[in-house]
Amino acid sequence: MRKLTVAILFALGLHGSAMAGLAEGANAYNARNYALALKEITPLAKAGNADAEHLLGLMYYMGRGVPRDYKQAFSWHYKAAVQGKADAQYVIGAMYYTGNAVPQDQKLAVQWFRKAAEQGHPDAQHALALMYRYHVAGMPQDLVIAYMLCNLAAANGHRNAIEQRASLVKQMTQEQIDEAQAMSRNWKPGTPLPTSSHTGGGGS
C-alpha cells in the first residue's frame, strides 16, 4: 500500500462581510505583520468567530507571531471546524491523519476530510481520493469514487488531483470512467458525497 502523504495547505477564504478587526488582522497577516495580526485576531477568536479561530490556529501551527504550538493550533482549528469552517475541517483531518498533537486516528481523519470535501474543499477531496484509491484507513478501494473526487478537486485547479486523475484513468475501464464523470456532474457542494459506486470496487 502506498503511503498517503497529506500536505497541510491553508486558504484563508475570508468573507467580505467579516468585521473590520478580522479584515485588518488578515491584512496584517498577509503583510507579515504578525504582531498586529495577533492583536486583531485574538479577541475575535475568543469571541467565537470561526474565521478568526482558523487564522489564529494557522499562526500557532506555523509559529508566526506566537511560539509554534501544535496543541494550540489543533484547539483553535477544532473550534472553527465544529462551526463548519471547511479549511479548519481539512486541517483537523490532516492532524488526525498524521497524529500531530493528537493520537493518530485515520477514521477521524476520514470523517473530517469528508466534512470539508462535502463543502467543496479541493485539498480534502484530493485526500479522500487517495484514500479510496489506495484503500487507506479502512476505506473501500473504489477507483470510481477516487476519480470523481479528483475530478472535483481538479475543477478547482488542484494540480496534484489533475495528475492523480491522469494516473487513475490508466487503471479504469470506460464504464468506470463514464460512471465517475456522471457522478461528478451530478454532485453539488453542500450535499453528501457518495461512499461507493457500481463499477469501481477493487483494482490494482
Predicted segments, located by residue:
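Short helix-capping/linker turns of helical repeat alpha-solenoids
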Residues: 29-33, 46-53, 62-64, 69, ...
